[in-house]
Amino acid sequence: DGFKTVFTTPTALVLTIGFSGFIFVITGYMTWVPAFLQEEFGQTQAAAGFNSMFWTYIAAFAGVLLAGTLSDKIAVRDRKVRMVIQGVGLILGAAFLFFVGGNMALWTIYLCFAGWGFFRAFFDANIYTVLYDVTPARLHASCSSALITTGFAVGALAPVILGAMKDSMGNLSATFPVLGAVWIVCGILMLIVSRTHYQKDYDKINR
């Protein structure tokens, strides 16, 4: 019932697509950014592992607190804003990925990591609130399982796909714009559906 509900409810379906793209990019980032820092900047494994995560998660900590508070305040007047915030977060986060692969100073790369982490939190903060807005309470756990299973199945492909791209292109720099494009597409889809279906799907289960 969880999969059926998620895949037949437009808002939940697009949320799942967005979540799949979200996890795909995060998995690709976590897998390959340490290697990128080692190859491009000569960092040790320990330094590359630390720098790939530290700047991102420090910024994400601030981002998730801001996004959660902002969503709760605005959603009182217009609940679809939660999905709007998710879509905007993906699009703005994607912008930083396009710069990571460029020929920039290391400190600028770290700023991009932080910017990406800050805006990814806008998606994080609203995942389950959006899902539960448009799915029946009796199926919340089943729908969550469907969303998570689908997202992780798609995300698991990222290391292989990016690895194949690296082999064909000779470096990792070209993979970051691809990750950015994934988030932009997902973000646009979420903005569209938040406007066309969110309230309708909410009303169906809250009559």
Question: What is each of the regions a protein language model found here?
Answer:
Residues L106-F122:
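Hydrophobic core of transmembrane alpha-helices in multi-pass small-molecule transporters
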Residues F96, V100-G102, P177-R207:
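Multi-pass alpha-helical transporter architecture, strongest
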Residues D72-G89:
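Cytoplasmic membrane-interface "Motif A"-like loop-to-helix N-cap segments
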Residues T44, V81-V84, A164-W183:
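A membrane-interface helix-boundary motif in multi-pass transporters
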Residues T16, G49-F50, G87, A141-S145:
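Conserved glycine-rich helix-kink/hinge and helix-boundary motifs of the Major Facilitator Superfamily
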Residues F7-L65, R120-D124, Y128, A158-P159:
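Extracytoplasmic gate region of multi-pass secondary transporters
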Residues L37-Q38, L70-S71, A75, L162-G170:
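Interfacial helix-cap and linker-helix signal at transmembrane-aqueous boundaries
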Residues Y132-M169:
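A late C-terminal transmembrane helix in Major Facilitator Superfamily
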